[in-house]
């Protein structure tokens, strides 16, 4: 995807289309207020680590990209079905149809970015490159609306620079603070009005008719021990995930389970935290 806020029908999110479990595996926070899969910098760093891991597995960048799209298991299976070929184009007929088209689309996009002008395309340069911005650690919960008001910054600009804040609210926890990214020209305005921004935020949050949502992280990695009477559908319902996800996380080819078997599950059951907002 070429949009930081992109989200697919199956839940792949952000510029690098991270699924929930893979994002968590590579350190991206997903909570009721924050989804770092939307953050271009953090998600790109995570994607680089993931791709490096896949390259270490397959020793080939084309295969690493195919595995990025469909998972290690599907690429390994395609290699086996192809008779052992270690080349993307030889195993392509044995890959899922979406993955068969993924690498050509990726390479075509890469080519267009590199040679756009040679083919008559006009490249729109960003009006606010990353080096023209900076971050501030927020000491008290605030909304982007309040920042926009006191720094005279367009709301669209703030949302563009801070895409990971799902509710346009920057939370503060007892044990963690978050950062606000601003144009360099607006840093001084924020610092000058910081106390007033916090005071306004406190008053507005207290005056809300509907209370703010509870902050909870969706990050539980669980090692589950299969018990008598368990089957994948039952376990999936228990942890609010899909059977296909459990199979993918554990490299299962069938639905067969053994008593005592250990399963890795990335549960969506929330872990609640207290907001340090007022």
Q: What residue spans do the PLM features occupy?
A:
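Short, surface-exposed glycine/acidic/tryptophan-bearing loops
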Residues: 6-27
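Extracytoplasmic and endomembrane cell-envelope/extracellular-matrix remodeling and assembly machinery
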Residues: 25, 30-33, 37-57, 62-233, ...
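Alpha-helical, low-charge segments enriched in small hydrophobic residues
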Residues: 1-2
């Amino acid at each position: 995807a070429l949009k930081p806020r992109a989200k697919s029908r199956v839940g792949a999110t952000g510029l690098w289309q991270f699924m929930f479990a893979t994002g968590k595996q590579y350190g991206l926070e997903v909570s009721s207020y924050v989804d770092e899969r939307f953050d271009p910098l953090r998600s790109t760093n995570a994607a680089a680590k993931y791709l490096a891991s896949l390259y270490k597995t397959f020793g080939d960048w084309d295969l690493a990209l195919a595995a990025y799209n469909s998972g290690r298991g599907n690429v390994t299976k395609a290699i086996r079905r192809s008779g052992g070929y270690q080349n993307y184009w030889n195993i392509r007929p044995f890959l899922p149809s979406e993955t068969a088209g993924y690498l050509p689309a990726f390479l075509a996009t890469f080519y267009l970015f590199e040679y756009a002008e040679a083919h008559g395309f006009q490249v729109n340069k960003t009006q606010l490159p990353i080096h023209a911005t900076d971050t501030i650690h927020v000491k008290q919960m605030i909304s982007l609306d309040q920042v926009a008001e006191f720094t005279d910054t367009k709301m669209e600009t703030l949302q563009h620079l801070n895409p990971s804040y799902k509710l346009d609210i920057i939370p503060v926890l007892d044990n963690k603070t978050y950062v606000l990214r601003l144009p360099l020209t607006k840093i001084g305005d924020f610092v000058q009005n910081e106390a007033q921004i916090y005071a306004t935020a406190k008053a507005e949050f207290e005056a809300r008719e509907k209370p703010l949502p509870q902050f909870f992280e969706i990050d539980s990695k669980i090692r589950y021990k299969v018990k008598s009477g368990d089957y994948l559908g039952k376990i999936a319902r228990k942890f609010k995930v899909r059977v296909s996800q459990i199979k993918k996380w554990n490299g299962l080819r069938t639905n067969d389970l053994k008593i005592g078997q250990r399963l890795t599950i990335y549960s969506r059951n929330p872990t609640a935290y207290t907001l340090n907002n007022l």
